[in-house]
Amino acid sequence: ATSLSTPKLSTTLSSPTLHSLLYKHKFSLLSLSNPIKPLHFNFLTHSRSTPSSLSCTRRRFTAPRAESSNGADAPRHYDFDLFTIGAGSGGVRASRFASNFGASVAVCELPFSTISSDSTGGVGGTCVLRGCVPKKLLVYASKYSHEFEESCGFGWNYDVEPRFDWSTLIANKNAELQRLTGIYKNILKNAGVTLIEGRGKVVDPHTVDVDGKLYSAKNILISVGGRPFIPDIPGSEYAIDSDAALDLPTKPNKIAIVGGGYIALEFAGIFNGLKSEVHVFIRQKKVLRGFDEEIRDFVGEQMSLRGIEFHTEESPQAIVKSADGSLSLKTSRGTVEGFSHIMFATGRRPNTKNLGLETVGVKMTKNGAIEVDEYSRTSVPSIWAVGDVTDRINLTPVALMEGGALAKTIFAHEPTKPDYRNVPAAVFSQPPIGQVGLMEEQAIKEFGDVDVYTANFRPLKATISGLPDRVFMKLIVCAKTSKVLGLHMCGDDAPEIVQGFAIAVKAGLTKADFDATVGIHPTSAEEFVTMRTPTRKVRSSPSEGKAEHDIKAAAGV
């Protein structure tokens, strides 16, 4: 699934928006003009059991007779306390936690496949099978070519050019995915969750149909995630999406990647590192809309230096297949020929088609995202939703947070709202990006007066490798309170470094706290605690749209 600013939770559709790595996503919150029923958190009729008793006995909770939202009497007894449709990150987390709290839980999921469809999926969901994990494995594979180049300056010589075998990588990747989906199945089994293979569809507020068999449940959770979206242009049948790109039979010789978001940049880095010729076509002037402006500029420059060709302000219009099998991409500025593959990384859509949600009254946005309140409850009181299907912040750790919060809300008598403040994120481009907190533009708008610290330097490794690699780091600080509002980095190990600093930003530490921290030398990370002089001071009232910049010498250059 982001700018990752803190969303202000609201129950109106006019609430502030949040960018989700590339794309601008509105929080899908229910309109006050048609409010849902108030939450009643005493969902279970028995007294709360102690953790020790729950670990020994799986209890079947009996719900009192209730009037369902469609006016029909709900059944007195249910097959399950929770029935989850979709065994991705959020669904598995919610189901496992709910079961640990003593609820009877079932999960349905489609049969395993590396490529998703209306009839295939797999336990583990997008992240494990078609996203984070396989993508990161391919990133690892692609980085070796750059490391071979770096090693020459350190005295390494190769009598024979290292050879890469695509089929070996894909076979080993798929074996790892099979192992991981098995682990997820065991997690559910060990938690006492019933796993049902098949396609689930909501029949009424308390009934799910799985391939013709009906199951009743006190609560239903929708966690079906999203699917890649390819625009409908002439020749789109020749295009591939991110699912297919992770499982191609052969490595592309020359690939066009349409899109300028994090998925596009990650795959551009992968195929460039594997020695494919890579062209990236974007509609904007710069990549990564929704990210910090200086990060956008920096990563584009660095990726260009590695041989990736960017075609800016170009919109795809058609794909043409030649007699020799090669593909041509026609854009608003002309035609580029000779591609072996054309990949679209133009966003993802919630996977809500044919789930029966409209018929039971679940409200959705125009793009199919399920509208939920702050507790992940839909417009139908017994139906809930977490993860990418709600189009909030489309990140795996966020889906995990939402799933855990939902289980506490329903089954632990602990109404829990997911906390979207200062969610860290990464782009595994080459070089990679890590960020947490506000972008500079957001900080100025919200706080007015900010001090900006930046460093742009050649890392120690590059001084001997001879390659043009650089690192960019940025701190955004509230001038009045000295609180660190945002932290951004592009360079080797940025995601690993930012994960640690995310704790500091989340905890509300100040620039003085950073300054008082002893750095680890020699590292790139130490720059975050050694920047002393602001690159610029921005002085502006939050309510005014104007800002004055006091430019000073850049720190760390």
Swiss-Prot record:
Subcellular location: Plastid, Chloroplast
Extent of the transit peptide: 1-66
List of catalytic residues: H521 (proton acceptor)
GO cellular component, one term: chloroplast
Biased composition range(s): Basic and acidic residues: 545-557
Disulfide bonds, paired cysteine numbers: C127-C132
Primary site of residence: plastid
Cofactor: FAD
Residues involved in glutathione binding: S89, Y184
Region (Disordered): 535-557
PANTHER family documented for this protein: GLUTATHIONE REDUCTASE
Something else known: The active site is a redox-active disulfide bond.
Protein name as catalogued: Glutathione reductase, chloroplastic
Gene transcribed to yield this protein: GOR
